[in-house]
Amino acid sequence: DADASQADMLRMRLGMYRLRADVTITDAALFVHRGLGPVPKDGFADPRHTEMGWRAYRDAPQTDETVDWTALRVALMIPETGIELTPDTFILEAQFEAINGVDFRKGCYVGQEVTARMKHKTTLRKGLASVAIDGLAETGTEITADGKVAGTLLSQAGNSGIAYLRFDRATGEMTAGGAKVTRKDTGN
């Protein structure tokens, strides 16, 4: 699924990859429903993280939203297209391996060579990371450490955030505007 603001771009991008396949890509005009708890018969477990609950595609919009999905997604480090994910994002830098977004056993796919090389021959030097924020900072604010640019704050929900960081500089105390920033995960 894709946000309505991203649908045309996604349809155009998928059209580039269909090559000679007899496939028509159209807008399904369905609405995403999501929830926590048991998965309904017409739904499926969100594959990105067990705590993200379930999703279903239905004809009418959801009217019973009770979960702050943005806060949950940011706390779980689930990047979203148009916010943390841009057209030039490398999927491993976006932590796609952790959210079941890439399979190294699959055959051919666009970007496979670059992705495999990044996985097997190098250590990531930069990418998305979960951060704790003490204070308020606007999204897009530069994050600094020891007077050097360490990254950019991309999202904030409460005291959690998602930032794009240079991992070599994001090892200690950092700031974004007047807010104190601390890296939560240390996987890279």
Question: Which residues does each PLM region occupy?
Answer:
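Acidic, low-complexity central loop/insert segments
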Residues: 1-79, 145
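Short, charged, solvent-exposed linker or helix-capping segments at domain edges/interfaces
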Residues: 63, 85, 174-175
